[in-house]
A protein has these predicted regions:
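Intrinsically disordered, Ser/Thr/Pro/Gly-rich linkers and terminal tails that flank
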Residues: 2-14, 29-33, 141-180
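Short acidic catalytic loops
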Residues: 9-25, 81-82
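Loop/turn elements at helix/coil->beta-strand transitions in domains of secreted/extracellular proteins
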Residues: 12-16, 41-44, 76-78, 102-107, ...
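Terminal peptide-recognition signature
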Residues: 18, 38, 79, 98, ...
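A mature extracytoplasmic/lumenal domain signature
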Residues: 22-24, 85, 112-113, 135-137
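Gly/Ser/Thr-rich loop/hinge elements
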Residues: 25-78, 121-122, 139, 145-149
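Extended C-terminal subregions enriched in glycine
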Residues: 78-100, 105-114
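C-terminal soluble interaction/assembly domains
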Residues: 110-126, 131-133, 139, 145-156
Length: 180
């Protein structure tokens, strides 16, 4: 598909910058499909639990989640993922999937993600208010909760001075990493 064309087009580059800052989420299937382009083997990416009863702590045992490599073109070079606190839901899941690939080539730069990977449940209350909460706790491969976000490998904040000068310090750091 189109991703094959893009990866072929970018094949001469030293690496890839994936900027997911301010991305509120989307489709979990797309997160997996994209991340599958960066691994050559099946990998454990985390665990999920499901509600099993009415009690506060009535959850199933953690069930493993795996990422299978794509059967299409896969990227073999460095990747820098740019994140901030406004990366939620499927974006948070994508960052976790990418961080689970232990090939030494994927680096998260920026700020902690916003979290929210737990398959949200939404309902309307009798008074018309809506409620939304994580229905299935989601953990990384080390059993650390993903709901509160994922810390970057390299933490960088854009200063007000940088913003006023339209200087993107995260992009600059990504270029620095890719040129090493």
């Amino acid at each position: 598909g189109n991703l094959d064309e893009i990866l072929v087009y970018l094949a001469t580059c030293n690496g890839l910058i994936i900027d997911v800052r301010d991305n509120g989420g989307g489709n979990l299937t797309n997160s997996s499909r994209i991340a599958a382009r960066f691994t050559n083997s099946k990998i454990l990416t985390g665990f999920i639990q499901h509600k099993t009863g009415t009690g506060h702590s009535d959850f199933s045992q953690p069930e493993p989640i795996y990422l299978e490599p794509s059967n299409s073109i896969r990227w073999q070079k460095k990747v820098v993922i740019l994140t901030n606190r406004r990366c939620y839901s499927a974006t948070n899941d994508f960052v976790n999937l990418m961080r689970s690939i232990d090939n030494g080539k994927i680096i998260q730069v920026g700020d902690q993600t916003g979290g929210g990977s737990g398959l949200p449940f939404t309902s309307e209350l009798p008074n018309g208010w809506s409620i939304r909460f994580s229905a299935s706790p989601h953990f990384d491969k080390n059993m650390q909760p993903l709901e509160e976000g994922i810390l970057p490998d390299i933490a960088i904040d854009m200063t007000e001075d940088d913003q006023s000068k339209h200087r993107d310090t995260l992009i600059e750091k990504a270029f620095e990493i890719l040129s090493e």
